[in-house]
């Protein structure tokens, strides 16, 4: 069996990726989120497939087909809520995974990091289109507001929006194509994940000290497989508790009202995991400026490796950078809160200050802190 594991063309790939993979001996639980994201992706594809068997992508029947899934299909409500809350877990793990990368300097593995950012964009696009499918009030108005932002693009904006809509408003054509894209994107994400892993295994994992660990490696199995199983059990405990006790905790009550183009909800807002970007979008009075800020709020991650000025890779021994990092985390939590509030005083000014702080920390303060820490090391 050992020989087969090491010689069989297919098993050899699995062996080199998950069994005999040399891993640093000191990676902490912050390195668990990669495997958790993989588990979330598999869960989303499986539950999504079963939902697609009963869902109809038509404006007249979409809402009632979701109701049918919850009421008439055997354990349909479990599948539906696992899928909806699984998305929340997915983004929770994503944000922690990206945060880990920022803190420990994993972004210096350029290819792995950039594909990770593309994965983040693809996951956000998938989640947005999935939110439109139940065809509730927030689905319809969310789709209208977000797609309409593309009209801010000079010259081609309006044509682009109507092309995406498949008409002059969000309607049947929009829902059908969103369903098609929502179905195919997770498989594209899976392919990107394999490329992400391919590049990661070219360099090997980073570690909390941010130093080369070639002299002290241990096999991935059994050490990190067991460690990952603990993470999976913890995640499934949280997810199942959410699904079974409070499935609508993270959803919007407006989405239990069928979509009505003649009635605008008082507060149009996306799911919680988009609120920070939505707050940045709303903080700029100009439409095109807001759209650019929205895109840059994620795209800025691609510039982080080029803004790294410190001689140390990780923030483990860099207290000034640590302070800035945790201020950034607090700022993102503030932006998430602001994104869910109405556009009125004092929320407008708080959102604007938090948005400016977000970009200032990443573009200006972090590189300055790295430079200062280098200077203090000499001193």
Curated annotation (Swiss-Prot):
It is found in: Mitochondrion inner membrane. Its cofactor is heme b. Binds 2 heme b groups non-covalently. Heme b b562 binds at residues 83, 182. It is a multi-pass membrane protein. A ubiquinone binds at residue 201. Keywords: Electron transport, Heme, Iron, Membrane, Metal-binding, Mitochondrion, Mitochondrion inner membrane, Respiratory chain, Transmembrane, Transmembrane helix, Transport, Ubiquinone. Heme b b566 binds at residues 97, 196. Its main location: mitochondrion. GO terms for cellular component: mitochondrial inner membrane; respiratory chain complex III. One of its GO terms (molecular function) is metal ion binding. The chain crosses the membrane at residues 33-53, 77-98, 113-133, 178-198, 226-246, 288-308, 320-340, 347-367. GO terms for biological process: mitochondrial electron transport, ubiquinol to cytochrome c. It holds the Pfam family Cytochrome_B. InterPro entries: Cyt_b/b6_C, Cyt_b/b6_C_sf, Cyt_b/b6_N, Cytb/b6-like_sf, Cytochrome_b, Cytochrome_b_C_euk/bac, Cytochrome_b_N_euk/bac, Di-haem_cyt_TM. It comes from the Eukaryota. The cytochrome bc1 complex contains 11 subunits: 3 respiratory subunits (MT-CYB, CYC1 and UQCRFS1), 2 core proteins (UQCRC1 and UQCRC2) and 6 low-molecular weight proteins (UQCRH/QCR6, UQCRB/QCR7, UQCRQ/QCR8, UQCR10/QCR9, UQCR11/QCR10 and a cleavage product of UQCRFS1). This cytochrome bc1 complex then forms a dimer. Component of the ubiquinol-cytochrome c reductase complex (complex III or cytochrome b-c1 complex) that is part of the mitochondrial respiratory chain. The b-c1 complex mediates electron transfer from ubiquinol to cytochrome c. Contributes to the generation of a proton gradient across the mitochondrial membrane that is then used for ATP synthesis. Heme 1 (or BL or b562) is low-potential and absorbs at about 562 nm, and heme 2 (or BH or b566) is high-potential and absorbs at about 566 nm. This is Cytochrome b. The gene is MT-CYB.
């Amino acid at each position: 069996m050992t020989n087969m594991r090491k010689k069989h063309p297919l098993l050899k790939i699995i062996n080199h990726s998950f069994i005999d993979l040399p891993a640093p001996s000191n990676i902490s639980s912050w390195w668990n989120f990669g495997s958790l994201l993989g588990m979330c992706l598999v869960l989303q594809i499986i539950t999504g497939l079963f939902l697609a068997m009963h869902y109809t992508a038509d404006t007249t029947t979409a809402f009632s087909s979701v109701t049918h899934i919850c009421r008439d299909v055997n354990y349909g409500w479990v599948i539906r809520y696992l899928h909806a809350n699984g998305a929340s877990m997915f983004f929770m793990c994503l944000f922690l995974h990206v945060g880990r990368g920022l803190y420990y300097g994993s972004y210096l593995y350029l290819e792995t990091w950039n594909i990770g950012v593309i994965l983040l964009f693809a996951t956000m696009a998938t989640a947005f289109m999935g939110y439109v499918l139940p065809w509730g009030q927030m689905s319809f108005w969310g789709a209208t507001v977000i797609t309409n932002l593309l009209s801010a693009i000079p010259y081609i904006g309006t044509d682009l929006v109507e092309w995406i809509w498949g008409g002059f408003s969000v309607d049947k054509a929009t829902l059908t194509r969103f369903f098609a894209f929502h179905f195919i994107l997770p498989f594209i994400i899976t392919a990107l994940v394999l490329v992400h892993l391919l590049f990661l295994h070219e360099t090997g994992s980073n570690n909390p000290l941010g130093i080369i660990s070639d002299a002290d490696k241990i096999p991935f199995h059994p050490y990190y497989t067991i460690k990952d199983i603990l993470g999976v059990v913890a995640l499934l405990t949280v997810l199942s508790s959410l699904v079974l006790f409070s499935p609508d905790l993270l959803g919007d009550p407006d989405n239990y009202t069928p979509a009505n183009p003649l009635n605008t909800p008082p507060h149009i807002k996306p799911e919680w995991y988009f609120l920070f970007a939505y707050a940045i979008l709303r903080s700029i009075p100009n439409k095109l400026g807001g759209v650019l800020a929205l895109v840059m709020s994620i795209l800025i991650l691609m510039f982080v490796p080029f803004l790294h000025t410190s001689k140390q890779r990780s923030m483990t021994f860099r207290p000034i950078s640590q302070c800035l990092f945790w201020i950034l985390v607090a700022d993102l939590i503030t932006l998430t809160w602001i994104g869910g509030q109405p556009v009125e005083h004092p929320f407008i000014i708080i959102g604007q200050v938090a948005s400016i702080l977000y970009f200032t920390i990443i573009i200006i303060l972090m590189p300055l802190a790295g430079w200062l820490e280098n200077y203090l090391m000499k001193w």
